[in-house]
Amino acid sequence: VPCQIFQDDTKTLIKTIVTRINDISHTSVSAKQSVTGLDFIPGLHPILSLSKMDQTLAVYQQVLTSLPSQNVLQIANDLENLRDLLHLLAFSKSCSLPQTSGLHKPESLDGVLEALLYSTEVVALSRLQGSLQDILQQLDISPEC
């Protein structure tokens, strides 16, 4: 299967996830907003390789699955599918991505979730949206492993 198919499917899923995030009304917060205790959520920085994309998405997936909000369940599932597509894309380019499914849960996550549920969701979704836009741009220039 040509890697272009995986790349196209990946782009389509990213656009779907961005649309889902836009449909959740409270995401009009800046991705650059700083909220004390949420520094474990990846910020906006260039994501240049497939392995870095996967690592970043794994953190977002972990954060979103830890939130009790029904709004983010579908997005978390979409992230799992997106990571699977990235692995297929990497495989089609003869890359091997390290398994990141067993990520270490940030120590601060449980305490932060109790105290800042709403803020965590807003910041995570806002930053995820920015990261997805960045990944979409990187896919256009065919990222390295």
Curated annotation (Swiss-Prot):
GO CC terms in record: extracellular space
GO-annotated biological processes: energy reserve metabolic process; lipid metabolic process; negative regulation of apoptotic process; negative regulation of appetite by leptin-mediated signaling pathway; phagocytosis; positive regulation of estradiol secretion; positive regulation of female gonad development; positive regulation of interleukin-12 production
Localization in the cell: Secreted
Sequence similarity: Belongs to the leptin family.
UniProt xrefs under InterPro entries: 4_helix_cytokine-like_core, Leptin
GO molecular function, one term: peptide hormone receptor binding
Domain of life: Eukaryota
Key words of the record: Disulfide bond, Obesity, Secreted
Gene: LEP
Disulphide linkage map: C95-C145
Main function: Key player in the regulation of energy balance and body weight control. Once released into the circulation, has central and peripheral effects by binding LEPR, found in many tissues, which results in the activation of several major signaling pathways.
Annotated PANTHER family: LEPTIN
Name of the protein: Leptin
Gene3D superfamilies: 1.20.1250.10
Coiled-coil stretches noted in the UniProt entry, renumbered to this chain: none
